[in-house]
Amino acid sequence: MLGLRNIILLSPPPTQITRPSLPPVNFAAVEDNNTVGEKVCRDCGNRAKKECLFERCRTCCKSRGYNCVTHVKSTWIPSSATRSSSSPSERKKKLKIDKQSSPNVSLLPTTTSRQERGFREGLPGKIEAPAVFKRTRVTAISNNEQAEIGYQATVTISGHIFKGFLHYYGVDHNKAFPCLSQK
């Protein structure tokens, strides 16, 4: 390792040129032969786009004031824009349990160790025990939705800690579930 990661090369912004006159400095080619051919930003050493005429990353192109057509479009999309624009009532309809069909739950193992399989097989199928539920406010990331109420629960089963979150689904008109509080 030659310690080239700490070298910063600065150059003044070009004056209406289409291609910089200096050859690119490729730190990756010096350090690792596997990455030869990648473009590296001439200012900071980060990866630069192949199409960038100024041979810089997006951040350096923007901060130096280069008029780069490669970095005009942004590929970043905010998470709020990717969410569906459904209202909270529509989301609750999607989350309601269909009482006509029996639930089909299957556990998929995340590991194949014998200890994990033995642990899962040793857990009881159903438990009726007191638990502590902590009321909490749940807010959505989008701007227009109001906070909802949920409960966080933590229980110990067979010496193992389980944590979960209970989401509000509405009033139990059919009295299908036992009432845990009279408040």
UniProtKB/Swiss-Prot annotation:
It holds the Pfam family DUF702. Residues 79-121 are annotated as: Disordered. The keyword Zinc applies. Residues 79-88 have a biased composition (Low complexity). Residues 41-68 bind DNA. Zn(2+) 1 binds at residues 41, 44, 52, 57. One of its GO terms (molecular function) is DNA binding. GO terms for biological process: auxin biosynthetic process; auxin-activated signaling pathway. GO terms for cellular component: nucleus. InterPro entries: SHI (IPR007818), SHI_C (IPR006511), Znf_LRP1 (IPR006510). Transcription activator that binds DNA on 5'-ACTCTAC-3' and promotes auxin homeostasis-regulating gene expression (e.g. YUC genes), as well as genes affecting stamen development, cell expansion and timing of flowering. Synergistically with other SHI-related proteins, regulates gynoecium, stamen and leaf development in a dose-dependent manner, controlling apical-basal patterning. Promotes style and stigma formation, and influences vascular development during gynoecium development. May also have a role in the formation and/or maintenance of the shoot apical meristem (SAM). This is Protein SHI RELATED SEQUENCE 6. The gene is SRS6.
